Design a protein with these regions (language model features):
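N-terminal beta1-alpha1 cap of cysteine-dependent amidohydrolase-like domains
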Residues: 1-233
Length: 234
């Protein structure tokens, strides 16, 4: 996209000013699977790398997003035609949760090639805390239902930070948090009990303007009257 050109130029200048031994270009790219032919296609990545080179950037590492494992044949093809080492072709396949990604990247050797490229002394990584977090995330002891009251719930990323915070808090307490999104515009005295009677807690998300304000006030009233724990974010 034309919007990314200033950022790519900034990266090029950083590489030029700091030198290749003090910088590293990691190119995240998609390896699509074509159902019709039953194969993963590397051509889009080859074109992407070529376009980067035309802008003065050479990828040191390819991180290849795919929905399945990349064979050594595909990795060799990418290494040959994209002019990177075989070990620098890193697969990033779909995982159960985004928090699996650091472990997968370590298994693929991304940490080692990064340290090697930047000439940083290699030490044994300690990911015990991260693995413990993953274990608690995937093995909750019980579940709770939290209502998220907002006016932008149709946009999945509008309350991303709140949703991620609930994941972190739930994991720390070994609880799976089921989030029920409720549009504040559609809350009234007739349906509020039906929408919220199964909630263990309520979060009223921030929003600008008068639209949906009455619904938020009703949600707070419901929480106070029924002694449901609630948090209002302004």
């Amino acid at each position: 996209d034309i919007e990314s050109l200033p950022f790519l130029e900034a990266v090029r200048q950083v590489v030029y000013e700091e030198g290749p031994e003090n910088s590293m270009v990691i190119h995240l790219t998609l390896i699509p699977f074509l159902t019709a032919t039953g194969e993963l296609k590397t051509k889009p990545t080859q074109h992407s790398v070529k376009t980067l080179m035309e802008l003065g950037l050479k990828a040191d590492v390819l991180v290849c997003r795919a929905d399945r494992e990349l064979s050594d044949e595909i990795k060799n093809k990418l290494a040959l035609f994209c002019n990177v080492k075989f070990d620098c072709v890193i697969q990033s396949i779909d995982v159960e949760t985004i928090y699996d990604v650091p472990i997968k990247m370590m298994e693929e050797g991304l940490d080692k090639v990064t340290l090697e490229k930047l000439k940083i002394k290699e030490t044994e990584p300690n990911l015990d805390k991260w693995k413990n977090f993953l274990h608690k995330l995937k093995n909750p002891t019980h579940q709770i239902n939290i209502g998220l009251i907002g006016k932008y719930i149709e946009l999945s990323d509008s309350y991303k930070s709140i949703l991620e915070s609930l994941i972190h808090a739930g994991t720390e307490n070994e609880v799976k948090v089921n989030v029920k999104s409720i549009h504040s515009e559609y809350i009234d005295r007739e349906n509020i009990g039906k929408d919220m009677n199964d909630l263990d807690g309520i979060i009223v998300a921030p929003g600008f303007g008068q639209r949906g304000l009455d619904g938020k006030i009703l949600a707070v009233e419901y929480a106070r009257v029924n002694k449901v724990p609630f948090l209002v974010i302004c």
